[in-house]
């Protein structure tokens, strides 16, 4: 396991599991403390060079084949290679666990609950981020006036590979077996994960609590561990 965030911090969870060449990220979220050092409500990364800023500030890990190819090509960070990341397992759709999904390649499968998908859809519809789709930023075409224009809308929109998981229904991602178990939290659709690898088992608690409407689910997860 490589921890690219979420250690001695609130949020920013980005845990990379590598077993026999199968590579899975668990969450891809924002660290509030880290972002707060550099950005504010009205000051964020540069729109067309955001990946450069996130690398230079040490907010995102430099892993080729992980990020959206239009950004990677723009900053001369590859973009034409195959990805080695097999999937992202999303515990839930709070920004400290999912905020950086818009930076990812669209062909990396994202496994999440139906509730998490709906929450991210709301992010897409009410904001400018791209959780369920990717809109290529640098695609251009020759318009009717013979001038170069930037393509927008459906011409540049690519759907992401969203895979809906079901509670307590195990599945496999190559050599890793995944068991998604519901837990109680302040939003619906939260899942903890138990991963079975060739080197042993890993439990990711997500954010959980022992009170609320689904407290029994949290107890069941603890027992399963």
Task: Briefly describe each language-model feature range.
Residues 2-9, 13-87, 102-225:
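His/Asp/Glu-rich metal-coordinating catalytic cores
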Residues 85-96:
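Metallo-beta-lactamase
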């Amino acid at each position: 396991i490589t921890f690219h965030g979420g250690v001695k911090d609130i949020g920013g969870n980005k845990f990379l599991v590598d077993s026999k060449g199968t590579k899975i990220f668990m969450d891809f979220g924002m660290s509030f403390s880290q972002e707060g050092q550099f950005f504010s409500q009205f000051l964020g990364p540069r729109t067309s060079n955001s990946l450069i800023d996130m690398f230079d500030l040490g907010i995102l890990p430099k892993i080729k084949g992980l990020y959206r190819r239009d950004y990677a090509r723009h900053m001369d960070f590859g973009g034409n290679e195959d990805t080695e990341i097999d999937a992202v397992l999303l515990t839930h759709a709070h920004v400290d666990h999912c905020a950086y999904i818009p930076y990812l390649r669209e062909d990396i499968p994202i496994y999440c609950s139906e509730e998490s998908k709906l929450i991210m859809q709301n992010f897409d519809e009410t904001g400018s981020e791209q959780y369920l789709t990717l809109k290529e930023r640098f695609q251009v075409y020759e318009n009717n006036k013979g001038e170069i224009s930037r393509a927008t809308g459906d011409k540049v929109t690519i759907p992401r590979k969203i895979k809906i998981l079901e509670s307590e229904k195990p599945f496999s991602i190559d050599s890793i077996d995944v068991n998604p178990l519901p837990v109680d939290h302040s939003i619906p659709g939260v899942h903890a994960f138990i991963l079975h690898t060739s080197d042993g088992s890993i439990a990711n608690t997500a954010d959980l609590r022992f009170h609320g409407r689904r407290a029994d689910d949290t107890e069941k997860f603890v027992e399963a561990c």
